[in-house]
Amino acid sequence: MSYIPKQQRDKVSSYKNLRSLYEQNITVNSISETMDTCHLHEDAEMIRRMMVIKDYDVLGVEDKGIVIGYVVRNELKEGSCEEYYRSFSPTELVSESTPLIDTLFFLKEIDRIFILEGNRVTKVVTLADLQKPPIRMLLFGLISLLEMHLYRIINHYFPEDTWKTHLNTNRISLAEELFSLRKSQNEAIQLSDCLQICDKRDIVLNEKPLRERLGIETKSKGNHYFKQLEKLRNNLAHSQNINTQNSWDEMFLLIEQTEKLLGACEKM
């Protein structure tokens, strides 16, 4: 086991605290929608028309004042809602205090989750809710944390700007220009503060021992991952759909990979 200097440990601890803020203090309630309900014996076609008008995909079903399940709009035809309602599956139910990041992984497996307040189902979350600001803030926070860790690790592994050997002259010049500009504004920085995420990517991927310690199997896989991460960050920064160029499955995989890489960074 390698020795981690106290200053490095303190930084890792502060990053963990920041990560905890994103992952534990923002809950599923921040993106959930209050779920309207219909009665078990109401006419299914009438309820479907109402759901179309209100743009509901699902609607809770009540019987004797208790929400016992839900109906899916596209499944409703002739008859009563009793013929079409689905009982809640245990895998579809989560507590209102569930961390938001866990919600992402639940929705990897199912189309919707329902929120329990006490012993009553009151709210719903679907894939469409993953475009909301709290999710965007969470994802941007995870990417920012990863960049902070990479900055820390690069400074530790490459003292006195020896990371320059892994960048081309154009990228170094761009960093130096930004460094000069920021120094002229009396910012207390070093050259590595001016590296972009693509620079950090190239430095890490070109240093094989470091790449392997971070659990990145090959340089090509690492390049693919970081390019997808940059696309996501750009979409977040410019208020584009999170999965503009990716399916949700690809997005969930990217988040899982980021979580894994963050875990490796925290051990260094």
Would you name each region that the model predicts?
Residues M1-M268:
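Tandem CBS (Cystathionine beta-synthase) repeat/Bateman regulatory domains
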